[in-house]
């Protein structure tokens, strides 16, 4: 049977993969956003695993809120990237740093 440890290991692997994605590919903003979403998914897996292990629904409810906020964050981030690409013609991180007030 799959226990709590297995879910925590999967969550840790996903979280480390997200961190690795951010550190390896600092040039592409879309990959950075996807890595952040992967890290949030890993945290949600841990919330659900602990919630199931303890028999409490609070972790699962909190996971739904985190998923909602993550979806809104991804939609707003991609909308900003589309506008930035239309204005600048690129979405490189170096070009994002030159934006001023």
Swiss-Prot record:
Bilayer-crossing regions: 4-24, 30-50, 65-85
Pfam families: Oxidored_q2 (PF00420)
Disulfide bond positions: none
Keywords of the record: Cell inner membrane, Cell membrane, Membrane, NAD, Quinone, Translocase, Transmembrane, Transmembrane helix, Transport, Ubiquinone
EC number per UniProt: 7.1.1.-
Membrane topology designation: Multi-pass membrane protein
Catalytic activity: a quinone + NADH + 5 H(+)(in) = a quinol + NAD(+) + 4 H(+)(out)
Enzyme class: translocase
Cell compartments where the protein resides: Cell inner membrane
GO molecular function: NADH:ubiquinone reductase (non-electrogenic) activity; quinone binding
Top-level lineage group: Bacteria
GO cellular component, one term: NADH dehydrogenase complex
One of the GO biological process terms: ATP synthesis coupled electron transport
PANTHER family: NADH DEHYDROGENASE SUBUNIT 4L-RELATED, NADH-UBIQUINONE OXIDOREDUCTASE SUBUNIT ND4L
UniProt-listed NCBIfam families: PRK05715.1-2, PRK05715.1-3, PRK05715.1-5
Family of the protein in this entry: Belongs to the complex I subunit 4L family.
Assembly mode: NDH-1 is composed of at least 14 different subunits, Nqo1 to Nqo14. The complex has a L-shaped structure, with the hydrophobic arm (subunits Nqo7, Nqo8, Nqo10 to Nqo14) embedded in the inner membrane and the hydrophilic peripheral arm (subunits Nqo1 to Nqo6, Nqo9) protruding into the bacterial cytoplasm. The hydrophilic domain contains all the redox centers. NADH-quinone oxidoreductase forms a supercomplex with ubiquinol-cytochrome c reductase complex (complex III or cytochrome b-c1 complex) and cytochrome c oxidase (complex IV), which stabilizes the NADH-quinone oxidoreductase complex.
Role played: NDH-1 shuttles electrons from NADH, via FMN and iron-sulfur (Fe-S) centers, to quinones in the respiratory chain. The immediate electron acceptor for the enzyme in this species is believed to be ubiquinone. Couples the redox reaction to proton translocation (for every two electrons transferred, four hydrogen ions are translocated across the cytoplasmic membrane), and thus conserves the redox energy in a proton gradient.
Name this protein carries in UniProt: NADH-quinone oxidoreductase subunit K
Originating organism: Paracoccus denitrificans (strain Pd 1222)
Lineage of producing organism: Bacteria, Pseudomonadati, Pseudomonadota, Alphaproteobacteria, Rhodobacterales
Underlying gene: nuoK
């Amino acid at each position: 049977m799959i226990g709590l440890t297995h879910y925590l290991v999967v969550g840790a692997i996903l979280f480390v993969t997200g961190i690795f994605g951010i550190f390896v590919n600092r040039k592409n903003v879309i990959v950075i956003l996807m890595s952040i979403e992967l890290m949030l998914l890993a945290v949600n897996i841990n919330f659900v695993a602990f919630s199931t292990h303890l028999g409490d629904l609070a972790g699962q409810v909190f996971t739904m809120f985190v998923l909602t906020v993550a979806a809104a964050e991804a939609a707003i981030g991609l909308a900003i990237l589309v506008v930035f690409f239309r204005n600048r013609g690129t979405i490189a991180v170096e070009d994002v740093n030159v934006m001023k007030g």
